C-alpha cells in the first residue's frame, strides 16, 4: 500500500507541545502536512501557561525538514480557538484537518472534586474540542476532504479510579464525535476519535500510583515502557487522511495494537407489557452479551 501522505494539507494539532500531541504533530509533518502546533503550555492539572512547548515542537518539526508554526492559545475559550484557525489560514492559506488532543489530568475522589476542578476538566477536554471544531468547521466544509480527529479514552468505561470528572468529559467527547459525525454525513467530512494507550506526563508512574493507590514501582516494567506516545499516532494519521472511510468511530491505539471501541447492546428480553418483575426474573438474559450487537452506529443517508 502506498504511504498515506498529507502534502499540501494544513493540520491543527491541539496540545501539540508534549506527549501524544507532539507525536501526532511530528508524524503528520513527516508525511507532508503543514502543522499548527497549538499549545497553551499548561501544567498537567491545567494551571499556568507557557509559549515554550509549542515553540520547541515547531522548531523540532522544522529541523526535521517539515513545516510548522506555533500557536500559543487555549482551547478553553473562543478567542483561543479562533486564533488557532487564523494561524492556519495566515500561514498556509487553508485548513484541512483538526486533531483535538489537548487535555489535563487532576485525579480526585468524587467527594474531593470541587466544582471548579470539574469545570476545568470539562473545559479542556470537552468544551475545548467543541470550540476548536466549531471555529474550524466552515473551513473544513470548504476543504476537499475535511477531517476531525478527537481524543476519547477507555476511561469512559468506568475503569479508572478517581476520574469522575475526566471520564465524564471524555464520555462527552465520545458522544460529540458520534453526533457530529451524523451531521457531517451530508458532506465529505469525517469525524472520528482515538482512545490512546500510552505513557505521557498524564500517565507516568507517579500519576498512576496516585490514581490506583499503588507504589510507583508497580508501573515501571517493560509493558508500560512499550506504550510510547508515538504508538498512538498511526490511528490519528489514518483517521486524518482523505482515504479514511470511517465516520463516528473510536479506535483504541497503542503498544502495537489498534482496535474498535464501540457501545454494544445485548439481545435482552421483549414483553408486550414489560414489568419490573420481568427484568428481575430474567436479569441474566438481559445482561447476557454472548451475541452482542453494536448499537447506534448506522449512519443513514440525508
Each PLM stretch: what is its role?
Residues 3-37:
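Canonical Rossmann dinucleotide-binding motif of NAD(H)/NADP(H)-dependent dehydrogenases/reductases
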Residues 51-55, 71-86, 115:
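The beta1-alpha1 cofactor-binding region of Rossmann-like NAD(H)/NADP(H)-dependent oxidoreductases
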Residues 61, 109-110, 114-119:
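Substrate-binding pocket helix/loop in short-chain dehydrogenase/reductase
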Residues 111, 158-164, 186:
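Active-site loop immediately N-terminal to the catalytic Tyr-X3-Lys motif
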Residues 133, 169:
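Active-site helix of classical SDR
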Residues 153:
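Residue(s) in the substrate-gating loop at a strand-loop-helix junction
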Residues 214-302:
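C-terminal helical subdomain
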Amino acid at each position: 500500500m502506498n504511504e498515506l501522505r498529507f502534502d499540501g494539507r494544513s493540520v491543527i494539532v491541539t496540545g501539540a507541545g508534549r506527549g501524544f500531541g507532539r507525536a501526532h504533530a511530528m508524524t503528520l509533518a513527516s508525511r507532508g502536512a503543514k502543522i499548527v502546533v497549538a499549545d497553551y503550555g499548561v501544567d498537567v492539572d491545567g494551571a499556568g501557561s507557557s509559549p515554550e512547548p509549542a515553540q520547541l515542537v515547531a522548531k523540532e518539526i522544522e529541523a526535521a525538514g517539515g513545516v510548522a508554526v506555533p500557536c500559543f492559545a487555549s482551547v478553553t475559550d473562543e478567542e483561543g480557538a479562533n486564533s488557532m484557525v487564523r494561524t492556519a489560514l495566515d500561514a498556509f492559506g487553508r485548513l484541512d484537518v483538526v486533531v483535538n488532543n489537548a487535555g489535563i489530568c487532576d485525579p480526585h475522589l468524587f467527594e474531593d472534586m470541587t466544582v471548579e476542578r470539574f469545570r476545568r476538566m470539562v473545559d479542556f477536554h470537552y468544551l475545548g474540542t467543541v470550540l476548536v471544531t466549531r471555529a474550524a468547521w466552515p473551513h473544513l466544509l470548504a476543504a476537499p476532504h475535511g477531517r476531525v480527529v478527537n481524543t476519547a479514552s477507555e476511561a469512559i468505561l468506568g475503569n479508572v479510579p478517581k476520574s469522575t470528572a475526566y471520564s465524564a468529559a471524555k464520555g462527552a467527547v465520545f458522544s460529540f464525535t458520534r453526533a457530529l459525525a451524523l451531521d457531517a454525513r451530508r458532506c465529505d467530512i469525517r469525524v472520528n476519535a482515538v482512545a490512546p494507550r500510552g505513557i505521557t506526563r498524564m500517565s507516568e508512574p507517579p500519576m498512576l500510583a496516585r490514581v490506583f493507590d499503588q507504589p510507583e514501582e508497580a508501573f515501571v516494567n517493560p509493558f508500560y515502557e512499550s506504550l510510547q506516545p508515538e504508538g498512538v499516532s498511526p490511528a490519528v494519521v489514518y483517521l486524518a487522511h482523505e482515504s479514511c472511510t470511517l465516520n463516528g468511530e473510536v479506535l483504541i491505539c497503542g503498544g502495537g495494537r489498534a482496535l474498535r471501541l464501540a457501545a454494544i447492546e445485548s439481545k435482552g428480553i421483549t414483553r408486550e407489557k414489560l414489568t419490573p418483575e420481568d427484568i428481575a426474573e430474567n436479569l441474566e438474559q438481559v445482561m447476557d452479551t454472548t451475541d452482542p450487537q453494536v448499537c447506534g452506529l448506522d449512519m443513514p443517508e440525508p
